[in-house]
């Protein structure tokens, strides 16, 4: 799949040069322009899908489904941040897979490390040794997975993808106050889940 997705807000995927023009060409049916957009944002989309699904094969499926949907819908794109529009489609594709999986008999949980893109440093993390980072990321991924779906999505979008509250609210079609509450409760729950590994996250 794609390279590891964005690590911190400073490393967020930036818009393509002349992205508005590329989008316009894609919307008019230019497949090369559309492929250029998808290649540019592939890592971000896969990273989001993986963190919502925690399964590399399902994340790949969700990303592919999102790109197919985006190809069909790009003609109706009406502006705004293209990255957020595409990530919203990716999140919806991931939720569709989750809903289908819930209707099937349960299967063994995948290894938390399998196919995992490298997690961005959350705001409260200050790793004090390079050797501890792998273990730290593992515990973070497992803890994120234990959050309720709405809290996990909000925390991932805000603390991993660097979106502000307004962007998260727009992307998840939620009220601003609801988003703030989800992020606050999600962060508190993460602290509780990671309390026994406190030495990994403090300097």
Where are each of the predicted segments found?
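Amphipathic, Lys/Arg- and hydrophobic-enriched alpha-helical face
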Residues: 38-56, 73, 144, 189, ...
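Arg/Lys-rich amphipathic alpha helix in sigma70-family domain 2
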Residues: 73-76, 88-109, 133, 196
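Helix-turn-helix DNA-binding module
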Residues: 57, 138-153, 157-178
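N-terminal module of bacterial RNA polymerase sigma factors
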Residues: 1-44, 145, 192, 202-203
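Sigma70-family region 2
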Residues: 27-28, 54, 65-82, 100-102
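Internal acidic/polar
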Residues: 4-8, 12-19, 104-130, 164
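Short, charged helix-capping/linker segments at alpha-helix termini
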Residues: 12-13, 27-36, 46-65, 176, ...
């Amino acid at each position: 799949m794609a390279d590891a997705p964005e690590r911190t807000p400073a490393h967020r995927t930036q818009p393509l040069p002349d992205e508005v023009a590329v989008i316009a060409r894609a919307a008019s049916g230019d497949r090369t322009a559309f492929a250029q957009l998808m290649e540019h944002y592939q890592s971000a989309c896969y990273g989001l899908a993986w963190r919502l699904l925690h399964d590399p094969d399902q994340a790949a499926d969700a990303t592919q489904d999102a790109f197919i949907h985006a190809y069909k819908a790009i003609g109706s794109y009406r502006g705004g941040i293209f990255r957020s529009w595409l990530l919203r489609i990716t999140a919806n594709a991931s939720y569709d897979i989750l809903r289908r999986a819930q209707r099937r008999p349960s299967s063994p949980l995948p290894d938390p490390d399998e196919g995992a893109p490298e997690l961005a440093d959350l705001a409260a993390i200050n790793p004090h040794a390079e050797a501890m980072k792998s273990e730290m990321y593992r515990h973070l991924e497992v803890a994120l997975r234990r959050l309720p779906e709405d809290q996990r999505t909000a925390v991932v979008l805000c603390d991993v993808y660097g979106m502000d509250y307004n962007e998260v609210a727009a992307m998840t079609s939620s009220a601003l106050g609801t988003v703030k509450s989800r992020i606050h409760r999600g962060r508190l729950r993460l602290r509780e889940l990671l309390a026994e590994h406190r030495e990994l996250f403090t300097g």
